[in-house]
Structures are given as C-alpha cells and as structure tokens.
C-alpha cells in the first residue's frame, strides 16, 4: 500500500489551454520547495465543496528539476463526478488545495535504450515531466501525441517550440495526420520501451498491435487514471471480520456498498484505482482487477484488490474486513 502524506498548497496561477483544459500552478504555502518527484509522478488532489468531497489523481507535468512549484492540467469531463468541474469552475488564484506527496506508477525504465511516448488527449501530461527529466540525458526519446484537431491539442505551442522539437510528432485526426500505429510499432528499435497514456481505445490499440507484433510485454507501460467502467454482474460480498454480507449491485463498487452501509472503515484517496490506499486482502474468491496500481504478477496472485474499482469474477467474494 502506498504511503501518502497530505499537505496544503496554494494556487498561484490558472491558465486556460483549450476550451476544456486548464493548467494549475501550485506552490507551497510557506514558500519553500515542494517535495521532490520524478517524471511520470502524480498527486492526489482532495477538494471540498460544501457537503461534497472529491478526490482525483493528476499527473505532474512540470519539471522534476524545479520543485519551486507543481503543475497539473485538468480536462473538464462531460460526465464529471465533480472534481474536474470544481477545479474548472470554482478554484482561483490564491485558493488552497490539499494534495498528496507525489507517487510514481509510470516511471521511466532506466535500462531502456530509447523511450517511445504515445499520448492521447489529456494523456500528454505525464510525458511533459518525462521529457523535462530527460533534458540532460543522452537517452533517446520520441513523442507521438494524438488529438482531434489543433485547437484541442493542449500544450501544442510549447511542444512545437520544444528545444528538441524534432522528436515531437503531433497527430490530428481532423487534418489527416492520424497516427499510423502499426507502422510506428513495427519500426521500433531493440531496447525501446513504449509508454502509453490516454483513453481506453488508444491503450487497447497499442496492446493489440504490440501483441500482434510479438513485442515483449515487459517493454510496454500504460497509465489511465479515468476508469471508464466500474460496473459488472452483481455478486455477494462477505466481510470476514464482522461476518456481514451484502449484495454488490451491477452499478455500484464494493467501496460504495461498504460506505453506504457503514460496514467497515476503509481509507481511499483517489477512487480511481491509482493510489493503493484501499488495498484489501482477498480471503475467498477472485477479483476482476480494474486498477492501475498492481503489476500483472500481483493481479495474477489474487492476494489483494483495490475495492474502489475492482469487482468479483464470480458470485461470491470474501474480504479481510
């Protein structure tokens, strides 16, 4: 389980980048440097709007070489659970937010000879800190960034003017420059690691094409904070410590059922399968893992699960709660 510490920061700048994306610059309330981080790190942002509490994970896009501030970018989601809407509509310069210390589930692989970044939409954010981290490195890298059109391409001007702009490739479906994924992956050099962040369709396309080309699974790395589907078949949940039983319906998560029934005390910061704070041991049954936290080996072991997003594979699941 990840060990997060929460602390307050102040919003020093809010910049609209596109119609749907804003960049927020965060500084320490005492003016001191913020905790160090590495490229690909994220923070959990906790927000309060009256009786409503929101908790979202956001990648740090600023340079790991400069901890005078953190920067995050937030896309206003159409079906927002409240967090992105709150940040877009209510947070202003001077406001304070509670965030976690950085954690990294999407770090660069030190042994890689080359890093190939594939981004879709707001999935560009972790790669900005990766690129900054590699600024003084001899390791080669290349970025392919997909968006609908130039107007929806956040950070477009900065990427076009990047000191190593020849490594940056922008793909817009509206202008006929769509990414040719099959060709890109077919031509990768030995020792290349591929990192993908973006919508589920992009991630699945990379997985499928990489499998077709027999690209080693341990050279593929994915990150996707917004879990698009937490629903599934209903099942019986048993809390072993209390002996309580509940039915988890199709449209609810295990965590929601536990909270609604005040059945156990469970800490969860992100509610998106990212932070690991709701990790719970499995005593009986198997989990349908939908998190971004565990490795493939940890998921296969079926020893524990993140109850904010994952479900039961069968009809009955017994947890150590």
Swiss-Prot record:
It comes from Escherichia coli (strain K12). Residues 233-321 form the 2Fe-2S ferredoxin-type domain. It catalyses: (R)-carnitine + NADH + O2 + H(+) = (3R)-3-hydroxy-4-oxobutanoate + trimethylamine + NAD(+) + H2O; (R)-carnitine + NADPH + O2 + H(+) = (3R)-3-hydroxy-4-oxobutanoate + trimethylamine + NADP(+) + H2O. Its cofactor is FMN; [2Fe-2S] cluster. Converts carnitine to trimethylamine and malic semialdehyde. Can also use gamma-butyrobetaine, choline and betaine as substrates. Pathway: Amine and polyamine metabolism; carnitine metabolism. The keyword Repeat does not apply. InterPro entries: 2Fe-2S_ferredoxin-like_sf, 2Fe-2S_ferredoxin-type, 2Fe2S_fd_BS, Beta-grasp_dom_sf, Carnitine_monoox_B, Cbr1-like_FAD-bd_dom, DmmA-like_N, FAD-bd_FR_type. Binds 1 2Fe-2S cluster. One of its GO terms (biological process) is carnitine metabolic process. This is Carnitine monooxygenase reductase subunit. One of its GO terms (molecular function) is metal ion binding. Keywords: 2Fe-2S, Flavoprotein, FMN, Iron, Iron-sulfur, Metal-binding, NAD, NADP, Oxidoreductase. CDD domains: fer2, PDR_like. Its EC number is 1.14.13.239. The keyword Iron applies. Composed of an oxygenase subunit (yeaW) and a reductase subunit (yeaX). Belongs to the PDR/VanB family. CntB subfamily. Residues 4-109 form the FAD-binding FR-type domain. HAMAP family: Carnitine_monoox_B (MF_02098). [2Fe-2S] cluster binds at residues 270, 275, 278, 308.
